[in-house]
Amino acid sequence: MKVTWIGQAGFLFENENIKIIIDPYLSDSCYKVNPRLKRNYSVEESFLKINPDVIVLTHSHLDHADPETLDYYLKDKSGVTVLASENAWNKVRTYGSEHNYVLFNNGTEFTVKGITFKAVYACHSDNQAVGVVFSVNNKTYY
């Protein structure tokens, strides 16, 4: 499994069978809300061209469930499984029925392409936030 940091709290996990994106934030939408939150580095444009099989949204803060970034991955596309904490799930379902939206609260397990994802407790100011754990080829990722 190749692991790539895509910025902020975002990661891409990929192998020959699956592409998983966790908490993608590839815009500057936080800056639009608060100019003190300006991005300090540029985004790698190639990250916007990824066709993920799974997107995990751990909570609904803009830097984890960014609508501008999600547009690239979900708008006018189909077949993405989106595992989202409750508040993020309520927002992301607006992209329509072309995707598989899974309510991913603490304790939820869901399997995609032979990989079981488990939502675990996360200590955060957002009380619906979760962490995610999954294993591939005898390696566990959190």
Where do the PLM segments sit?
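Catalytic core of the metallo-beta-lactamase
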Residues: G10-E16, T111-Y142
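Active-site neighborhood of phospho(di)ester-bond hydrolases with catalytic His/Asp-centered motifs
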Residues: I22-D23, N51-D63, L83-E86, Y142
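Short, polar loop motifs at secondary-structure junctions
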Residues: G7-Q8, S85-K91, N105-T108
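Extreme N-terminal starter segment of soluble prokaryotic enzymes
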Residues: M1-T4, K19
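Metal-dependent catalytic neighborhoods of phosphoester/phosphodiester hydrolases
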Residues: D66-D76, T94
